[in-house]
Amino acid sequence: MSDNTVDYKATLNLPKTDFPMRAGLPKREPEWLERWAEIGIYDRLRNKTERESFTLHDGPPYANGSLHIGHALNKILKDMVVRSQQMMGKDARYIPGWDCHGLPIEWKIEEKYRKKGRDKDEVPVLEFRKECREFAEGWVDIQREEFKRLGITGKWENPYLTMDFHSERVIAAEFQKFLMNGTLYQGSKPVMWSPIEKTALAEAEVEYHDKESFTVWVKFKVVGTGDATLDSAKVVIWTTTPWTMPSNKAVVYGAGISYGLYEVIGRPEECWARIGERFILADRLAEDVLGRARLDTTMFRRLCSVTQDDLAKIQLLHPLHGVKDGEGEWDDIRDFRAADFVTDTEGTGFVHCAPSHGLEEFELYRDLGMLEQVITYNVMEDGRFRADLPFFGGKAILKPNGKEGNANGAIIEKLTEVGGLLARGKIKHSYPHSWRSKAPVIYRNTPQWFAAVDKPVNDGLDTYGKSIRDRALTSIDELVTWTPPTGRNRLYSMIEARPDWVLSRQRAWGVPLTCFTKNGSLPTDDDYLLRNEAVNARVLEAFEVEGADAWYKDGAKERFLGGIVTPEDYTQVFDILDVWFDSGSTHAFVLRDREDGSEDGLADLYLEGTDQHRGWFHSSMLQSCG
């Protein structure tokens, strides 16, 4: 190589600067964040007076676990909005908050107990609540530092927490509005129930996953028609929940469906249908149903049509009718009637009804005034059959780990033994699961506390409607601006079709339903619920100082009722509120009550993902309209 190599760098007129070649962000970013904290950047931005305010109300994340990418996206989007409004000259307020009560935290504490061989039900409730509070406090601190590391500007030294004493007081006060305005009631209806967590769940606490389920085609014997052609024929139902068969009380058919009577004239081996057996089926589904029983089209024939008049004469026997050692559990005649929810798109054209485990069936017999005849209480809170149920007592629908229990197998085996099955199989379908335990849920009839969404609200505030539903729908159209506009349609359709709000949960970590019921009265009696402003005021005063723990302390009932009514005449309710009621009440204890909330108690913006149309948007709308 020649010694005369040209140094081209020396021939260039390069600018010189004191700026470092690399930004050094890993080192510099923490320094900037520390500087912002030292000077109190959020409060300094508030110092300028007489500016138009802008309030973004933060939907609270759950105080459980470290941040994930969804948290980051959510908070960064909010930070962009707040900073933009600030740079446009507004007083842009952002108070971060956390959802601190509820099942996910209880579940973590119970996991700790299980590892130690400790039974949660044997732990004093105040001790359990203390552990839940400490767990939530720990995760609030961790998540706060993680959010600050993302550079999010907000009131981090004084966020809102749903477990703060003042927050719990306000949540109780908001609940008392429902108590006093007549929309709160105790009812018994099928709700989504988690046997693993032993509590009712809201729709927003459920997620859908594929699940493989047992599926059975079951025969009900026809009696009482006086028609030799129909008597002793079998009506066939199809279900993916064999565990509901012991609770069957009826079968329903469709008023507009064409039905026929089909006779078996041949059969293969290992077939549960017998030659000469006759089945009533929807014509559109008959070939498929009989095919499930391994009968090809040469092995059965259609004898005749079965008219609506014919169906109206039919009575049915449960497949376990008269079974030995059944103790008469299934020996009464099963109701048989038309229902508008029956179709012939799948199944058999008939639907088996266990009104304790299906909302449509429950509503059908409620409207008929026949609930007392059809409601059963066969399934306990842990998903096991009551101990004295013949054949199936103590059998579990689900194991404690959420896997398939032994109930379905035992029922299928018994139905096979008595000749009650036409066919069986398995099906993979979308099925509701608890979002926390990931275990399947069931529908179970239990006494719960509800907010009636269609009952007139007795508060004299009818500008936007008389009922919670009417007010919510009017507010969606007249008081809220939607971006994108499709968000309006999503929430409107959900609220338009939703049932009454299940407020109660059978858990311990949350704000209790601060109410009392009168001994000897029925839920339908006017005096069943104690509605007393002086009692309510005592409760709220205690919650402000001691938090919701005051409800669980010894002598609480006498403390709140003594000198006003006779404590011995009332029972204290210990269910806790749905955590969505907690977060739905944040407008009251953040926007309304805090000096740095908003002047009019309203937010300029709620910014969340579309999942909150059935979550926080939904509960905030319902709660504020009650």
Regions found by a protein language model. Give the residues of each.
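Short secondary-structure junctions
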Residues: 42-44, 297-305, 315-318, 420-426, ...
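Hydrophobic or amphipathic alpha-helical targeting/insertion segments
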Residues: 93-95, 100-103, 174-180
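Histidine-rich, glycine-flanked metal-binding segment
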Residues: 22-52, 290-296, 305-306
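Acidic, glycine-rich active-site loops and adjacent beta-strand->loop/helix elements
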Residues: 60, 98-102, 383
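Protease-associated
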Residues: 250, 257-350, 359, 363
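Residue patterns forming the tRNA-binding/recognition surfaces of aminoacyl-tRNA synthetases
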Residues: 2-18, 22-25, 31, 35-39, ...
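Conserved active-site neighborhood of enzyme catalytic/cofactor-binding cores
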Residues: 62-96, 107, 111-114, 192-197, ...
